[in-house]
Amino acid sequence: MFIIITLLLTVLVSGIFGAVPAVVSHRRVSRRDAAWAAGLWLAVWVFALCAYHRPGLTVGFHAFRLVALTAMTGWAGLVTAGLRSLGRKGLKAVVPLLAVTALGLEMFVGNVAYFNTHSYTPFQLVDYLDDNINVGRGVGTISLDEGRTYLRFLDIDQPIYNLRFDGLVSDDTEPLHADSAVIFTIEGTDAANTELTRFGSWQVGLQAPRTQVISLDLTGSVGMLTLTAAGYSSTYAQFPVALTFRGITANAPRALDFSILRFCAIFLALLAVYGLRPASGLWHRRWLAGNVCDRAAAAVLGLVLAAFVVVIPFWEPSNTGLATKDYNTAFWDGESTVSFVYQQYGALAHSLLNGRLDLEADPPAELLALDNPYDAGARDAAQINDIHWDHAFYNGRYYVYFGIVPCLLFQLPFEALTGIQNLAYAPCMVLLGLIFLAACFGVVGQAVRRWFPQASAAAYLLAVAAVALGSQFYCLLLRPYIYEYAILCGAALLMLGLWLWLSAASTPVEKRGALVVKLVFGSLCVALVAGCRPQMELFAFLAVPIFWPRYIGQKRLRSRAGAGEAAAFLLPVVLVAAGLMWYNAARFGSPFDFGANYNLTGNDMTQRGFNAVRIGPAVFTSLFELPSWQGVFPFLRETDVQTNAVIRTISEKFTGGILAATPYLWVLALPLLPAFRRCLHRRRVAACVVYGSPAVMVVMTVVDCEMAGVLYRYLMDYSPVLLLGAALCWFCAEGALSRRAALGEGTAAAALPALRTVMAAAVAYTAVYRFCTLFAMEPYLQGMNPSLYYTVSRLVQFWM
């Protein structure tokens, strides 16, 4: 009865909303309106058929389901009718509709489990627990531990559509395990499986309530069901089984669990889709025109990207290097408002303030006695465990081989001003990340201003997003270790320096004061990169094409003013180079020895040398290996470097080579086309960036694999400038097609929207890929922050 009424009601509602655009436009209802109404009605019922498949759409169909489906039809009708009627009225009309769309998607789709479980009749699964099973039994509670991990339920003989833990708490008293995870293997028998069969696993975050219920898709009545618990375990985190619960409810009606975070994410995604559609004004207005809507879009993009910069470094509490009574409490000293743990740069800052270049810590006598202290096997054989891992060891003392600049910028002044040692890297990386992000906006903006003034606002915004998301920027933020800290500092200074250089090259010579300031600070930033990540200094060659037109082409260098500007450009480079060379010579006896070969790590860096067999696997893995996608969160699988060479390979896991995993970069192949090449060559400086960045990419890949290994974070050495080169190609292609389309060329007019769609799709893919890498890559949020990992997992996989 109710289903028939619902069918009729939804037909009526669909018909009304299908006709609304005709009424608003004062025209007769057309077949197109009828098609919209029919499509709307069909879409709602197809969704209902999928959503109510447990136990079936017609089973338990009552008034609540009638109201739910009618309301969903009304929401979908309102949205479609509104977009059809007001879609071309501009943002003021569309934004409220997009908000309503996001609200409905969160309510009806994100909370589909609330609607499809409303009619369930729950029962307590613990009533069927086998009395012979060894578990901890309290007053109304059951406990599991490492010796008791098995639950068996017998003679259930009724369907089970979901399971929910009631009153689940952790019994683990170890502070490091305050946030932990347990994985239950589910086995049982049902109408289709008379023998015990493994059905799947249930990953439970003890501080992630969304994970404490799971949907089951079993056949018919369940006879027996077993749950076997195992603590999550990886190289970086291991959790024991230690939990207590009051019960396990089967066929539990799910609560309405509205997520503001998911609603905001959906709304922003819809806003981006609307803003980047081919007919959008963002594509038809020049960025340099300064339109208020374009600037507002840039502000939204910047705020979203900056929000992730601020929060990501704190996603892995035990790796942040700081602790309070409420955050990372396992490392809190119990007294300070904020306490910091030992960090290499903190120890270096303390030594520098005490007039020393080495660290104050004394190496163990057993290490000093070894013939080759860099041999990890020899250290293990001598049972020397009390060493400073990844520190340089030279002439019996510990040193920091990582570049000194991050320490000079943050740790040293912090201790000098406050007296507090070991400033954590995470807050420093937040500041550096914001600088890098601002520099991305600035560098791309200068490129548009100088070479592509006709570039659309959408192309500019997509380019900024591509540089930030396509590089390993956010992956560095996720791991606030000294390795990532030094690389991020180098990348931020490099991009800031390039921004200042480009701005200087665009500054009129009449404004000499501003010009000199930009030259000095631009060169200072780029020079300081050598004290962070020396490899990145290869991009200093960009100074030649940037300043060539003015100082060589226009012969300004021959003038007194030009010579003074050249001196301003060179002075910071000379001073920084002299300082770094003195620092190296004072420690290791050579101005060119940064000390990386004296690293106490898992292999003897002093014997590494050059070997050509490393190059092939490194180039393939770093550049061309395809991402390995899977059907479950986080949707990406890590891969290891593969090689047939019988050699010690130093590597970390990858999720695809940068060229294969970043479609935005594929446009770098366009210069192979003669017509595009001619167009690009009209902007010779831009062409130098386009050609130079892939060349540096190859050189750095080879250098990194020979010097250290094949590591994903090393892609950050060149990826920002490489992505900038790709952005220049997109600008060039868009500009060429726009000019030809304006002249009436049909092919160009048809190709331009396609190009823009592909550009937006490439950045969208990159954003999804980067989001997945944050949850897929080591040291694995699944173990470092289970509550965050599993909560996000369930927000994405809402159907579970």
Where are these regions (language model features)?
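Hydrophobic, aromatic-rich transmembrane alpha-helices
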Residues: 13-25, 644-684, 740
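Transmembrane-helix motifs of polytopic, lipid-linked glycan transferases
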Residues: 423-453, 496, 500
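Transmembrane-helix signature of polytopic, membrane-embedded enzymes
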Residues: 28-45, 441-472, 492, 508-517, ...
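Start-transfer (signal-anchor) and selected internal transmembrane alpha helices
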Residues: 3-40, 64-110, 260-343, 458-460, ...
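Interfacial juxtamembrane loops and adjacent helix segments
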Residues: 338, 342, 354-402, 468, ...
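Membrane-interface alpha helices of multi-pass inner-membrane proteins
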Residues: 495, 517-533, 540-541, 567, ...
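Specific aromatic-rich, kink-prone transmembrane helix
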Residues: 488-509, 524-526, 540-542, 721-725
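Perimembrane helix-loop-helix junctions
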Residues: 539-574
